[in-house]
């Protein structure tokens, strides 16, 4: 891959099941940390469309009722497996299923309460958005 010229626009998807539990994944991209599904917004794609697509690709889940949480800047964080500059747009959403089908980007998953999530090793960006959700700071 060529050197990065511009920040990359990405989306993070905070998926809640009908029991109010949050889906967290472990990925080789964030060693030892829990994260949420997500990825790049493709050219010509709306951010919400990217969230729906990424959730389906990474988990097999259909999502609905997307609510914007926040955006965060990620500039060359050594916690990530590559030197990148991202702009994250995070969304909370719902799913009617708990049948997760992981693709090759994740190694394992858990459904947890928000309270339990706060006690897990999450990356800084995921933790920030979880704390905003707990505080009720959704747009």
How should each PLM-predicted stretch be described?
Residues 1-22, 92:
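Conserved N-terminal beta-strand and adjoining loop/helix that marks the start
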Residues 17, 21-57:
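Conserved Nudix-box catalytic region and its N-terminal flanking loop in Nudix hydrolases
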Residues 92, 101-133:
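NUDIX/MutT-family hydrolases
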């Amino acid at each position: 891959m060529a050197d990065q010229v511009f920040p990359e626009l990405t989306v993070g998807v905070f998926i809640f099941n009908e029991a109010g539990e949050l889906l967290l994944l472990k990925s080789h991209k964030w060693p030892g940390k829990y994260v949420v599904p997500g990825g790049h917004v493709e050219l010509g794609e709306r951010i919400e469309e990217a969230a729906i697509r990424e959730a389906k690709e990474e988990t097999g889940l259909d999502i609905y009722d997307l609510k914007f949480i926040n955006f965060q800047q990620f500039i060359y964080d050594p916690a990530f497996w590559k030197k990148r500059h991202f702009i994250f747009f995070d969304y909370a959403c719902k799913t009617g299923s708990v049948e997760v089908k992981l693709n090759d980007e994740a190694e394992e998953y858990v459904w947890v309460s928000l309270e339990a999530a706060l006690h897990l090793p999450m990356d800084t960006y995921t933790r920030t958005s979880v704390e905003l959700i707990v505080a009720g700071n959704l747009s």
